[in-house]
Curated annotation (Swiss-Prot):
Family according to the record: Belongs to the cytochrome P450 family.
Catalytic activity: (+)-costunolide + reduced [NADPH--hemoprotein reductase] + O2 = parthenolide + oxidized [NADPH--hemoprotein reductase] + H2O + H(+)
Residue sites binding heme per the record: 448
One GO CC annotation: membrane
Function: Involved in the biosynthesis of germacrene-derived sesquiterpene lactones. Component of the parthenolide biosynthetic pathway; parthenolide and conjugates are promising anti-cancer drugs highly active against colon cancer cells. Catalyzes the conversion of costunolide to parthenolide.
Pathway stated in the Swiss-Prot or TrEMBL entry: Secondary metabolite biosynthesis; terpenoid biosynthesis
Protein name as annotated: Parthenolide synthase
Species annotation: Tanacetum parthenium
Residues linked to a glycan: 32, 63, 121, 168, 175
Name of the gene encoding the protein in the UniProt record: CYP71CA1
Annotated InterPro entries: Cyt_P450, Cyt_P450_CS, Cyt_P450_E_grp-I, Cyt_P450_sf
Subcellular location: Membrane
Domain of life: Eukaryota
EC number(s) stated in the UniProt entry for this protein: 1.14.14.-
Length: 506
């Protein structure tokens, strides 16, 4: 073929398409400016053609970048990323409008291919639209996973696994540091999996992939694809970089893993007593009674358990231990309280924690400075509304920067960027969704249903670690030298692992 004649014939239609698209976009933008003039739009950083504000937020720590931008553009700020508009809320007052005043219309999640696929077509409680299905599924989740009849079994599992950790630490060679990240992640995996599934699957690879690898990969694909931001041509980038194949592989691994768990429970159902039945047994029984409660519904709820309960809990415990050890006066004060409340016992009991006021301050301060999910999962605006006096249009995603809100110097007047638990002595703010000054678990209808069980796990773990052991940094380090750099996107973890030396106290 003569390429000198074929190339123009291929290039000319492409050039015409680009020119026509440019003309259309130009006139649409002009029309938009004139039609939007009557509305009070939120302030926004300068945008570039096509990509919008992506260049402003393309950073390692998006939560910190958005917080810095909010200081210039205000607590209600519009960020455009291609075809998607995000309203970023960075103050407790504006968060109150979103979570309480407008919760009726701002209770639906935005959708993308990743969330749709992994949630079994929005069958779960995290990503499903607000409505009857979401209410029914949340009710099942709360009753069967978090209800009073499950509390005793949860406490028993937690106590057994903590005891195992304490025994392992006690046999640790003298003056030898341990990786608390690995230890605590393993602990939380075992607690969650044994409570929900009846046994820990962490060390049992499925199709050559570990559960941790599956969950890490799911967090990547849930973050979205190029097509989510650029519907017109983003699919080309997804194709080039294999995003769709990656999504299908991730889904296939998770689906196969859940199928295995369900089948194991179906086979053992007749041999399992009522006292021994776990979360999956309850869901399987429900599906046998109600054909509309499908196997996909079970799998969607299992994904919610794994994604919602493991990384966030483990991350918070690591941050808490990091801050406690870094601030030696906090560690001394907290250990004094813990050891005086418990006395000399062979085993710590959950009732021992009742009067530990300083412990609760330390956990509050940890969740304030280090919310596990710094950017709360977005809500989509289905109809026009006003937030902070600004017009917000349908399709806009509303994102609350919980990380920034909890560091607002207008609210947190005493050293807002420092770890100072004593601030809560005369500042009656909780993190359970009643106050918007700190919202690590969200607030309103879409708040995290497992916040109380997560808090119980964090409290009981910290108390045991600090009751049985004193903690030192490795030789050659000072406590104040602990690296507190953040890393991650959906869940913010401590970038460098926490290595500490446990010294048996009792």
């Amino acid at each position: 073929m003569d390429t000198s004649t074929s190339f123009p014939s291929l290039f000319l239609p492409t050039l015409c398409t680009i020119l026509i698209s440019y003309i259309i976009i130009k006139y649409v933008l002009i029309w938009n400016r004139s039609s939007m003039a009557a509305f009070n739009l939120p302030p926004s950083p300068p945008k570039l053609p096509i990509i919008g504000n992506i260049h402003h937020v393309f950073s390692k720590n998006v939560n910190q970048t958005l917080w810095k931008l909010s200081k210039k553009y205000g607590p209600v700020m519009l960020i455009d990323t291609g075809a998607k508009s995000f309203l970023v809320v960075s103050s407790s007052q504006m968060a109150m409008e979103v979570l309480k005043t407008h919760q009726e219309i701002l209770s639906t999640r935005p959708s993308n291919e990743g969330t749709k696929r992994l949630s079994y077509n929005f069958s779960d409680i995290t990503f499903s639209p607000h409505g009857d299905h979401w209410r029914d599924m949340r009710k099942v989740f709360v009753n069967e996973f978090l209800g009073p009849k499950r509390a005793g079994w949860f406490n028993q599992v937690l106590r057994m696994e903590i005891k195992d950790v304490i025994n392992n630490l006690s046999s640790n060679p003298l003056n030898t540091s341990i990786n608390l990240n690995e230890m605590l992640l393993s602990l939380v995996y075992r607690v969650v999996c044994k409570f929900a599934f009846g046994k820990s699957y962490r060390e049992e690879p499925f199709n050559g992939v570990t559960l941790k690898e599956m969950l890490d990969e799911s967090m990547v694909v849930l973050a979205g694809s190029s097509a989510d931001m650029f519907p017109t041509f983003g699919w080309i980038l997804d194709k080039l970089y294999g995003w769709n194949d990656r999504l299908e592989k991730c889904f296939g691994n998770l689906d196969g893993f859940f199928e295995m768990i369900i089948n194991e429970h179906l086979q053992s159902a007749s041999e399992t007593s009522e006292d021994e039945k776990d979360f999956v047994h309850s869901l399987v029984e429900l599906s046998l009674k109600d054909p509309q409660f499908t196997k996909d519904y079970i799998k969607a709820l299992l994904l919610n358990v794994l994604l919602g309960a493991i990384d966030t809990t483990f991350t918070t415990i690591v941050w808490a231990m990091s801050e406690i050890v870094k601030n030696t006066q906090v560690m001394q004060k907290l250990q004094t309280e813990i050891r005086s409340c418990i006395g000399r016992k062979e085993e710590v009991d959950a009732t021992d924690l009742t009067n530990m006021a300083y412990l609760k301050m330390v956990i509050k301060e940890t969740l304030r400075l280090h919310p596990p999910a710094p950017l709360l999962f977005p809500r989509e605006c289905p109809s026009h509304c006003k937030i902070g006096g600004y017009d917000v249009f349908p399709g806009t995603c509303v994102v609350m920067n919980g990380w920034g809100i909890a560091r607002d110097p207008n609210v947190w007047k005493e050293i807002p960027n420092e770890f100072y638990p004593e601030r809560f002595e005369n500042f009656n703010i909780d993190f359970l969704g009643n106050h918007c000054e700190m919202i690590p678990f969200g607030a309103g209808r879409r708040s995290c249903p497992g916040m109380k069980s997560a808090t119980s796990t964090i409290e009981f773990t910290l108390v045991n670690l600090l009751y049985w052991f004193d903690w030192e940094v490795p030789s050659g380090m000072n406590n104040q030298d602990l690296d507190m750099e953040e890393d991650g996107f959906l869940v913010i973890q401590k970038k460098s692992p926490l290595f500490l030396i446990p010294i048996k106290h009792i």
